[in-house]
Amino acid sequence: AASQEASKPKANGAAAKNKSNGTPFETAFRNIDDALWKDPGCTSELDYTEQTSWILFLKYLDDLETVKQMEAELQGKKYTPIIEAKYRWPVWACPKGKDGKLDHHKALSGPDLVGFVNQQLFPYLKGFKQKATGPNTIEYKIGEIFSEISNRVQSGYTLRDVLEHVDALHFRSQEEKHELS
């Protein structure tokens, strides 16, 4: 493992640790790269990008669902989220207490988190492809995405760290969405 880590590119490495300036997105991405660099399942920049992407996608999707739900409520309508409750970001990725902070008693970590992601979350999301009414639906696209990738993060503690960094990001305003691009 030590020789594997020595051969890994350092992404943003030590230089990033000395820089705290930058946008919240830049800071989060540096922290995510630093966390993934330590994981034995992520051995290249391509791995960092793929793993960061699926996590960001699920956070983005949950923020989008939250906005749609709020808009429906303002119009006196009911909105049913695409993702079942137990697979929504605030339930599995970053459950919060009444104070709005991460509830460490409910938050999965270590082998429990990796087990949930690999054995429940990914199979659930892959199943969207079969349930979709057509290839142009968001459900089909979700299923297609999660049929093509896998969770490579082996440490549930690393994954917990990455989830917390991503959770600090929000994709609710146009400015926030633009910053991500």
Each model region followed by its residue ranges:
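Non-catalytic, mostly N-terminal accessory regions of nucleic-acid modification and defense proteins
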Residues: 1-181
